[in-house]
Amino acid sequence: MCPQPHADHAITRGDTGAAGGRNWSGPFRKTPGRLVGMTLIRAYQLTLSSFIGNSCRHLPTCSEYGFEAIARYGLWAGGWLTLFRVVRCGPGGTHGFDPVPDSLAPRQRWYTPWRYWQPRRKDA
């Protein structure tokens, strides 16, 4: 059986649904690092993603997750979150609903990127 859906996801994250597009459209600071990272992910979505097919095990997809993570937390933290998400998506990894965390834990500092790894999510 499917777990209880997270109905508050669209409300708290600024998603606009199908009319707004597939990527996160909430507010974020437009720094050069964020814009570069988001541009690279968007270029991947428009070019290479169609060749790879629908093979992501998670919702949102890994590229949507990366776009949101970089928009919310910047290129460094969002990039690490995205890398670890792609690793979790591989064989033997997790599946299902796996959103970007609402906030980073205090122990997740820029100089300790290994702490961004979240092998298992606790259901709320």
From Swiss-Prot:
Main location as per UniProt: membrane
Keyword Cell inner membrane attached: yes
Cellular location(s): Cell inner membrane
Annotated GO CC locations: plasma membrane
Taxonomy, superkingdom: Bacteria
Pfam families (alphabetical): YidD (PF01809)
Family matches, as InterPro entries: Membr_insert_effic_factor_YidD (IPR002696)
Entry keyword Cell membrane: yes
Membrane topology: Peripheral membrane protein
Keyword list, A-Z: Cell inner membrane, Cell membrane, Membrane
Record region (Disordered): 1-26
Biased composition range(s): Basic and acidic residues: 1-12
Family membership noted in the UniProt record: Belongs to the UPF0161 family.
Protein role: Could be involved in insertion of integral membrane proteins into the membrane.
HAMAP family noted in UniProt: UPF0161_YidD (MF_00386)
Name of the protein in question: Putative membrane protein insertion efficiency factor
Species name: Rhizobium meliloti (strain 1021) (Ensifer meliloti)
